């Protein structure tokens, strides 16, 4: 079990007040199921923690490899000894255990992702992924030569999946979208098997909607001369001629936003959703293979969505 005190590694920060008042953050902690060095989801959480350290002048801690309830319980106990009162569990796997232990740590607020927060000191965060998927689908459909697009998602509940399908069909009525699932965010081997099946069916643009395998998928698409839509991070650096654009979830910015709400005494319990309008979702850099006219059109569509809440088809994302 790894337990890191970032203020010792990076910068010794003073000025932390003694005691714990409602709405006042003493120190912050982060739990990640894998590592902060994955370059995608875990790294985003780590960057958010560093942002909190800088913005709010607090000590921050993180633990990696937090995959089971026993390790999570121990980590929260350890955090409490360090006067941590705002804890981020960087994934849906933390929602249930946070609900269970919340009553034992009433002076802490426990924040997770994509779950159901039921206690007064728990909150679950969700990125509203439909719109980003819609814009990703539009972009993919504008560049396909075979009219066959593919999605390799982790789970069927991901709203970006249906968003991608609807966006692709809005842009190109001839487009067919084939969807497959891995059943886990990190099953790279399974995802690559799914990719082989899609490529055998003449799919020429793929949306790997899973942060644990998207890099592997994009690398293989690059080798085969196909296109990708990046996921979670702006993945244009993996190949600007391969990655048409990316659907970017700024977990780092969201963590700073949540820390600000907590400090102001405005962080609500329960389940909260966030979208483009909150500044925590965006589209990544567009590939140079995409015509300037289409880029301009997409930027106008995105701005209109931020301003009005309506997508290019005139509809709002489904609830």
Language model features with spans:
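C-terminal motif of bacterial Sec signal peptides marking the signal peptidase cleavage site
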Residues: 12-15
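Periplasmic-binding protein-like
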Residues: 84-91, 111, 201-212, 231
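Extracytoplasmic "Venus flytrap"
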Residues: 27-48, 52-55, 61-72, 92-94, ...
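Bacterial signal peptide processing site
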Residues: 17-20
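Hydrophobic alpha-helical segments within soluble ligand-binding/sensing domains
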Residues: 125-147, 248-264
């Amino acid at each position: 079990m790894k337990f890191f005190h970032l203020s010792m590694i990076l910068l010794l920060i003073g000025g932390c007040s003694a005691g714990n008042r409602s709405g006042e953050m003493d120190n912050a902690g982060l739990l990640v199921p894998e590592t902060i060095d994955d370059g995608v989801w875990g790294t985003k959480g780590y960057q958010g923690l560093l942002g909190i350290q800088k913005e709010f002048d607090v000590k921050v801690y993180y633990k990696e490899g937090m995959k089971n309830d026993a390790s999570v319980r121990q980590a929260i106990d350890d955090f409490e000894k360090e006067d941590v009162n705002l804890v981020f569990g960087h994934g849906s796997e933390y929602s249930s255990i946070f609900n269970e232990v919340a009553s034992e740590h009433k002076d802490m607020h426990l924040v997770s992702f994509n779950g159901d927060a039921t206690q007064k000191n728990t909150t679950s965060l969700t990125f509203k992924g439909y719109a980003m998927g819609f814009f990703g689908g539009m972009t993919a459909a504008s560049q396909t030569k075979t009219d066959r697009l593919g999605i390799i998602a982790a789970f069927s509940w991901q709203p970006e999946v249906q968003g991608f399908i609807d966006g692709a069909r809005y842009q190109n009525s001839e487009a067919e979208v084939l969807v497959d699932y891995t059943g886990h965010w990190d099953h790279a081997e399974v995802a690559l098997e799914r990719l082989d099946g899609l490529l055998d069916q003449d799919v020429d643009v793929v949306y790997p909607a899973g942060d644990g395998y998207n890099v592997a998928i994009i690398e293989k698409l690059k080798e085969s001369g196909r296109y990708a839509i990046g996921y979670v991070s702006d993945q244009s650096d993996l190949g600007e001629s391969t990655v048409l654009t990316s659907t970017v979830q700024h977990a780092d910015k969201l963590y700073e936003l949540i820390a600000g709400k907590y400090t102001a005494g405005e962080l609500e319990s329960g389940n909260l959703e966030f979208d483009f309008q909150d500044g925590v979702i965006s589209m990544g850099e567009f590939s140079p293979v995409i015509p300037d006219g289409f880029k301009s059109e997409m930027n106008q569509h995105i701005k209109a969505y931020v301003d009005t809440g309506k997508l290019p088809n005139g509809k709002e994302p489904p609830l």
